[in-house]
Swiss-Prot record:
GO terms under biological process: protein insertion into membrane; protein transport
The UniProt record lists the keyword Acyltransferase: no
Subunit structure: Interacts with the Sec translocase complex via SecD. Specifically interacts with transmembrane segments of nascent integral membrane proteins during membrane integration.
Lineage: superkingdom: Bacteria
Organism: Marinomonas sp. (strain MWYL1)
The protein, known as: Membrane protein insertase YidC
Length: 551
């Protein structure tokens, strides 16, 4: 009896503790430099400093000189603005870099009209993407600084009825080589196709390397939505031929820079719910890099040297994704990019759980109701197993007086008392560990749903009813955690009373402890637990009354 109870609550406590540890690991404070230091450095270093650009080594080109610092800076008013149904981006003509990106279908804050801004190049935060051509003849490696592109106009809009929009930037170097940098935007998409065409009108063979990278300072994640001062994971990630998905923190970039060669993969910067990623052409050899330069974290790729004969043209292409962690969008953009929706080691359970949750939501149009219905589905799947466990617990409750008599009769002779209790269990066909199964079975589902709620952008700002306006954050009035504690008390009343007074007191404290523990958990997760407890109480109550009536 004692062993069963200790095992049951021990499993619950350990699972909760492991959950908190995982929360701290995934959403704990990142070891970044102070924001003040980063902001100060921005007055000295802006997003257009070309010493941030990669240096093409002897293995990829004949040139290996360090790229000089750009001296050209374009005023913010001269940026090229592009608007689609999903994105509003700004392109700096210097280098043709994307320096701003707003997600038009996602609000910065609940109830506010302003869209969420993921990329920006301002006085308080630098998070931009850079791309171009380096190497022997690459214009981004010119001693005079990065190329200043021209465009036909300064504002582009994806018109109604159009499925794509091409934004072309033009530049001609001193040798007469013509460059066309094209950004192709697509309706309903967050991926941007980049094409750099080199028209070698000179008399010499052109040689250069394609590069693309993401550059970010150490400022906090503006999309964080956790409590207790905890922050979501903010850092890089790499995918290559050896590993499908590897996190690379900003501190790792500084202490142990990464440089690896591959023919498939991508590089990305992750934050809560959103991601930016560069995907080179698959099948072509590239070097993936993650490093720091001053106060900036840089992750990107550099291609091998390309040669274009005089009078010929060549096009170097890649894809940039900037937007929410929508799994269908990520899967269609690049292999393994959907792994940036990090469900942890229970991904194999979390993925189908999310699929089922999404399917239910498509019918009920409410994520809170979908969570309740998914609990019903889980309870239905494990109904027989739970029923057997509850019958075992009901029998334990029924024979509680006899167990108390055995304890009184044999006193301190624990060996004899254990023998008599086991004989009683065998006679009455009672499984002393049977009551553990309901909690143990639902623990993986509980942990998986935790990751689903924390990682799925679909639940960001998703309302339920009444006071719950966002299921991805804590209950603002702590009503659900209190209801969860009450449900645990009720569930305890249906269980057999522990024979040990100290154990009984500990059991009474557990609902209070778990209520406090769950105060800061996402409301959707607590809603799942309250619903699960309520259905368990109903099932256990019916079974307990049935067994008592049989007596």
């Amino acid at each position: 009896m004692d062993f069963r109870r200790y095992f049951l609550w021990g499993a619950l406590f350990i699972s909760g503790y492991l959950l908190f540890l995982q929360w701290s690991q995934d959403y704990g404070p990142q070891s970044t430099q102070s924001v003040a230091q980063s902001t100060q450095s921005q007055s000295e270093t802006n997003s257009q400093m070309s010493d941030d650009l990669p240096m093409a080594t002897q293995s990829t080109t004949e040139a290996n000189a360090e790229i000089p610092q750009s001296v050209t800076k374009i005023a913010p008013g001269k940026l090229i603005e592009v608007t689609t149904d999903t994105l509003r981006v700004a392109i700096n003509p210097v280098g043709g870099d994307l320096v701003e990106a707003a997600l038009l279908q996602y609000k910065k804050e609940l109830g506010q009209p302003d869209p969420f801004v993921i990329l920006e190049d301002g006085s308080e935060r630098t998070y931009v993407t850079q791309s171009g051509l380096v190497g022997q003849d690459g214009p981004d490696a010119s001693p005079e600084g990065r190329p200043v592109y021209q465009s036909e106009k300064t504002a582009y809009t994806l018109a109604d009825g159009e499925n794509s929009l091409d934004v072309n930037l033009y530049y001609t170097d001193a040798k007469g080589v013509k460059y066309t940098k094209t950004f192709r935007f697509m309706k309903g998409k967050y991926r941007i196709r980049q094409l750099i065409t080199v028209d070698n009108t000179s008399s010499n063979t052109w040689r250069g390397n394609l590069f693309a990278q993401i550059k970010r300072d150490n400022t906090p994640d503006p999309s964080k939505a956790t409590s207790m001062g905890l922050q979501p994971y903010l850092g890089g990630a790499i995918s290559d031929e050896q590993t499908k998905y590897t996190k690379v923190s900003f501190s790792d970039m500084k202490e142990d820079p990464i440089k690896t060669t591959t023919t498939k993969g991508w590089v990305a910067v992750l934050q809560h719910y959103f991601v930016s990623a560069w995907i080179p052409e698959q099948g072509q050899k590239v070097t993936l890099q993650a490093r720091t330069n001053g106060d900036f974290n840089i992750i990107g790729f550099t291609g091998t040297s390309v040669e274009i004969a005089p009078g010929k043209q060549g096009t170097l292409s890649s894809t940039f994704y900037v937007g929410p962690k929508l799994q269908d969008h990520l899967e269609s953009t690049a292999e393994n990019l959907d792994l940036t929706v990090d469900y942890g080691w229970l991904w194999w359970l979390a993925k189908p759980l999310f699929w089922l949750l999404t399917l239910i939501q498509s019918f009920v149009i409410n994520w809170g109701i979908a969570i309740i219905l998914i609990v019903v589905c889980v309870k239905a799947i494990f109904f027989k197993l739970s029923a057997a466990s509850y019958r075992s617990m009901a029998k334990m409750r029924k024979f509680g007086p006899e167990i108390a008599k055995l304890k009184e009769k044999y006193g301190d002779d624990r060996q004899k008392m254990s023998q008599e209790m086991m004989a009683l269990y065998k006679k009455e066909k009672i499984n002393p560990l049977g009551g553990c199964l309901p909690i143990l079975v639902q623990m993986p589902v509980f942990l998986s749903l935790y990751w689903v709620l924390m990682e799925s952008v679909e639940l960001r700002h998703a309302p339920f009813f009444l006071w719950i306006h966002d299921l991805s954050v804590m209950d603002p009035y702590f009503i659900l955690p209190i209801l969860m504690g009450i449900s645990m008390f009720v569930q305890q009343s249906l269980n057999p009373t522990p024979p040990d007074p100290m154990q009984a007191r500990i059991m009474k404290i557990m609902p209070v402890a778990f209520s406090i523990f769950f105060l800061w958990f996402p409301a959707g997760l607590v809603l799942y637990w309250v619903t699960n407890n309520t259905l368990s109480i109903l099932q256990q109550y019916v079974i307990t009354k049935r067994i008592e009536n049989e007596a």
